[in-house]
Every structure is written in structure tokens, then in C-alpha cells.
Regions:
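Aromatic/acidic polysaccharide-binding cleft in carbohydrate-active enzymes
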Residues: 341-422, 438-441
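Active-site neighborhood of glycoside hydrolase catalytic domains
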Residues: 216-234, 244-350
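Bacterial Sec-dependent N-terminal signal peptides
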Residues: 1-40
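N-terminal catalytic cores of secreted or lumenal carbohydrate-active enzymes
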Residues: 61-235, 256, 266
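C-terminal beta-strand-rich structural cap/linker in extracellular carbohydrate-active enzymes
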Residues: 485-495
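Carbohydrate-binding surface patches
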Residues: 428, 439-477, 488
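Structural preference for beta-strand elements that scaffold enzyme active sites
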Residues: 94-98, 132-134, 183-187, 234-239, ...
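Conserved, mostly hydrophobic/aromatic
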Residues: 97, 129, 186, 238, ...
Length: 495
């Protein structure tokens, strides 16, 4: 019998007797006062079930409600998802995706009614609840060409202009902002400084930011923020550099952990603060899970650097040299830096093939990553392009990829992949500021995560990636509801 409730750093409650252990506050509260009392407050509650099941062609289908009945000690032979609302962890900042040049250009090639449909599908009241928008500062691979916002060799940055973005990107971002409302959360990432600031004199294929341009480049971020905010787009945050360890055929720039730290400590951080942008959330790393712990522990080892960083961003592409995703590196990093939030800043399925856009494996890739990322402490989750065309682009270096929504710009047809529905099982029902609560499974084939929304709704997402149908039980403090988890399905249960 427990006599303590564990609650992670970041709780707004004013408890007494806090003691910091392993990055979490252990709060001394009597068992009979607050522990194991979910059903005392929620007697008779049923669970609404939403299911996506590829074999039955069901997509976010309402399956009715399930009742909870007394269920004592589960046996090892009984499949269960265990949820304990007493154990509370990180709060959700939000879920969303990137509005890149490619997404925006594709968007404005579509008929007006399709544009409206896509905005509603992601950001509207009947959509899947996206609140996060990421974009690129300067060009990236998902641009139609390379570009910057200044004339060559303009160290004064007097020529700075975001006119390029006003044609497609800014209008689409503002459409999303209008639909989202107050929860709109926008951040940006640079892929490369202008070529003349770099060691290789190219925006492509890596290279480094030359030392003499560190401050000029820091000032560039300020210009970008001011121009976007002048247009009514409030900037919530930024990453220092997209994928700082990748020498790509597209826009890229290399920083070691020490170099990123020096740039943040001596240039970017002070420049943001000096210009009144202390509230902007700076995220370091913004690359794969494989090196996240090493980068964080190195870059943030200096308190004078760490004070400028609010979060640690990461991508999912470590499988290029690993068989599986390295989720455990996230929890290790979170334990090391309980005062920094973890942010998934990019992921997509590469090697686009139009004939495979309805494969359920696309959705399962997203479900597997989202559930594990949240269970390891992630507070913000951002997909890559929200929209791409029938080629998986446009992309000026031929790096064509999948997206949750694919639009055929020749016919005007809009395709919703399983990526869209699997993400929606999380993003539509788990709201910003929801708090993750304790969840585990006694079957490897079933993975799950749970959050408590601010209105008291308890939301559990369960995925079965196996080839077998599984009957399971959603078990909460001695009460359980029977659920069917069909092969290759995902479901959301809302209490």
C-alpha cells in the first residue's frame, strides 16, 4: 500500500514536504487522503472508445462506451494496461507539425475548398487538435530552391527581408494560427546560415559557421523574430540549428556540442535577452536520439550556457545506423536535466512511394514513436511536413518523403494516410497542459500512454502493432474495462 504520491518537476501544486529525488518531487501525503481514490471521485464513469483498425477500414471510429467493474489482482495470463492517476509526470506543451515551403506551396496549388478542408483537418474544432507549428528560417531541403533573407556579404543585415515567405509560408501559418486560436505555439529552426558566413561557402553539404560571423548570425535570428511578429505571428521558441551533426546534400551546418554551447552562451542567448526575448524557448540539439545525452550533458554543463536553454530537441532518424529507436536515451536525458523539457522536433517516413500512402505501417511508425516518446518524458511533439504533393515534395534535392496528408496537385485530390489518424488518436484527445500519468502494459505487443486533461478527462492511447487480435483490460485502481485490441490497430479510451 502506497503512502506517497510521486509528481515530477513542473507541477503547479503548492505541496509541502517536497524532496527532490532523481528529478522528481516525492510528496508526502497520507494514503487515505489522496492515493487510490480515482473511483471515489469518478464512480460510474465509463470509457468512450475511438478505434482505428486497418483491416476493418475503420478510422477514428466511435465504438461506444465500456464499463469498469471490480477487478482485483490481475493474473499474468490476463492482458492488462495498468493506469495509475496518482503518478504524475510531465505536462504536454502541444502536438503539431511543420509548415515548410513545400507544405505551403502545395497548399496554395489546391482549390480553395481543399485548403479550407486541410486547415480544418489539422487545426479546426473538428480536426485532430494540432497547436504546434514549426517552420524553417532560410531554405531547407523542403524548399523549391535555396534562399536567404539578406543580400550576399551584407554583414549589417540592412537588406533583411522575409518577402520570400510572404507568398506561401506566412499566409498558411496565419491560417493555422487563426484556426488554432490561443493555443497557437510557433517555433522555427535554421538549416544553414547564408553561404558567405560559412567555411565551405555553400549552404549545402555541411560546413561551419565562421567565427567572425557568430554575432551576425545571432542578430539574424532577431531580425527573423521581429519580421514574423510584425506580421502577427508570435514566436514561442526556436532551435539553435537543425541537425548540427549531419553533413547533408541539402542545407546544413555543423556544430560540435562545445561550439553550439559557445554560440548560445556568447551570442544567441545574450542577444535574445538584450532584445527583450528572454521568454523565447531556446532548444538545443535538434537532431537524433543517439547522441542526445552526450550533447545535452556537454552543451549544458556550463551554467552560463544552460540558463539560455529551455529545452532539448530531437529527431527519430537514428535508425540509419541502429535497428531500433533509442528511446531510453530520452529518459536518461530527462533525469539529467529535469528543468529542461524534451521536444520531438522532426520525424517522417522517407523514400516516398505514392502506391504506399495507405499502408498502416506508416501510422504504426508514428504511434510507436509518440507513445514511447511521451512515456520517456517528452513534452512537445512535432511532425515534419504537414502536407506534401504527389511526388512527396517539392524538395529541391530530391529527398522525397511521406506526410500525414498527401495532395495531388494535378487532380486536387487530398489523401489522408494512416499517419494522420494515428497521430490524431493522441493529438485530438490529449490537450495542451494535460499531464502524463503512470501507465504500463504486461504484453509486449501492446504499448500505451495516458494523460489527464485539465478538465479531469483521463485519456489512454493503446496500440497493437502485432498480427494477433488481443483481448485486454484497462485496469485503474482495482476496476477494469474489457477492450478488444485488433491486430494492427490503435485506440483511444476517454473517461
Amino acid at each position: 500500500m502506497r503512502s506517497k504520491i510521486h509528481e515530477c518537476v513542473g507541477s503547479n501544486k503548492n505541496e509541502i514536504g517536497k524532496k527532490l529525488i532523481a528529478g522528481c518531487f516525492v510528496i508526502g501525503i497520507a494514503f487515505n487522503a489522496n492515493a487510490q481514490d480515482y473511483w471515489k471521485k469518478n464512480a460510474g464513469k465509463t470509457g468512450k472508445v475511438i478505434l482505428t483498425h486497418s483491416k476493418a477500414n475503420e478510422k477514428m471510429a466511435d465504438k461506444g462506451s465500456v464499463k469498469f467493474e471490480k477487478f482485483g489482482q490481475p493474473k499474468e495470463t490476463e492482458a492488462c494496461i495498468f493506469v495509475d492517476p496518482d503518478f504524475k509526470y510531465q505536462k504536454l506543451i502541444g502536438i503539431g507539425g511543420a509548415i515548410t515551403d513545400a507544405s505551403a506551396e502545395t497548399f496554395y496549388k489546391l482549390p480553395k475548398n481543399k485548403q479550407k478542408e486541410i486547415i480544418e483537418a489539422y487545426y479546426g474544432k473538428n480536426g485532430i487538435g494540432y497547436t504546434i507549428v514549426r517552420t524553417n528560417m532560410n531554405s531547407c531541403d523542403f524548399s523549391s530552391d535555396s534562399y536567404t533573407y539578406v543580400a550576399d556579404n551584407d554583414t549589417s543585415l540592412k537588406s533583411f527581408s522575409v518577402a520570400h515567405d510572404e507568398k506561401y509560408k506566412i499566409p498558411m501559418i496565419k491560417e493555422a494560427q487563426k484556426a488554432i486560436g490561443n493555443n497557437f505555439t510557433f517555433y522555427f529552426s535554421p538549416w544553414s546560415p547564408p553561404a558567405w558566413m560559412k567555411s565551405n561557402k555553400s549552404m549545402l553539404k555541411g560546413g561551419r559557421l565562421e567565427n567572425q560571423y557568430y554575432q551576425t548570425w545571432a542578430d539574424y535570428y532577431i531580425k527573423f523574430i521581429k519580421e514574423y511578429e510584425k506580421r502577427g505571428i508570435n514566436v514561442w521558441g526556436l532551435t539553435v540549428q537543425n541537425e548540427p551533426m549531419a553533413t547533408q546534400t541539402w542545407e546544413s551546418c555543423i556544430y560540435t556540442a562545445e561550439e553550439e554551447g559557445e554560440f548560445l552562451k556568447n551570442n544567441l542567448g545574450p542577444t535574445l535577452w538584450k532584445n527583450g526575448y528572454k521568454d523565447k524557448k531556446v532548444m538545443i540539439w535538434d537532431h537524433n536520439r543517439d547522441l542526445i545525452y552526450q550533447r545535452a550533458t556537454t552543451t549544458l554543463s556550463d551554467p552560463e550556457t544552460s540558463k539560455y536553454a529551455a529545452g532539448i530537441g530531437y529527431h527519430w532518424y537514428e535508425t540509419w545506423n541502429n535497428k531500433t529507436q533509442l528511446f531510453d536515451n530520452l529518459s536518461e536525458t530527462q533525469r539529467a536535466f529535469p528543468d529542461k523539457f524534451l521536444a520531438f522536433t522532426e520525424g517522417c517516413k522517407e523514400q516516398f512511394d505514392m502506391s504506399k500512402i495507405y499502408d498502416v505501417s506508416l501510422g504504426e511508425l508514428y504511434g510507436r514513436n509518440m507513445i514511447n516518446d511521451f512515456n520517456k518524458g517528452t513534452a512537445l511533439w512535432t511532425d515534419w511536413n504537414v502536407l506534401l504533393d504527389e511526388t512527396g515534395g517539392p524538395n529541391h534535392v530530391g529527398n522525397f518523403c511521406f506526410a500525414p496528408i498527401i495532395a495531388d496537385t494535378k487532380t486536387g485530390e487530398v489523401h489522408y494516410t494512416y499517419e494522420y489518424y494515428y497521430v490524431g488518436h493522441v493529438s485530438k484527445y490529449i490537450k495542451p497542459n494535460a499531464q502524463r500519468i503512470g501507465t504500463s502494459s504486461n504484453r509486449a505487443a501492446l504499448i500505451a500512454t495516458s494523460f489527464m486533461n485539465e478538465n479531469g478527462q483521463l485519456v489512454t492511447v493503446i496500440m497493437n502493432e502485432s498480427d494477433q487480435d488481443i483481448e485486454t483490460n484497462l485496469w485503474i485502481e482495482g476496476m477494469a474495462a474489457k477492450l478488444q485490441a485488433p491486430a494492427h490497430s490503435i485506440q483511444t479510451v476517454i473517461l
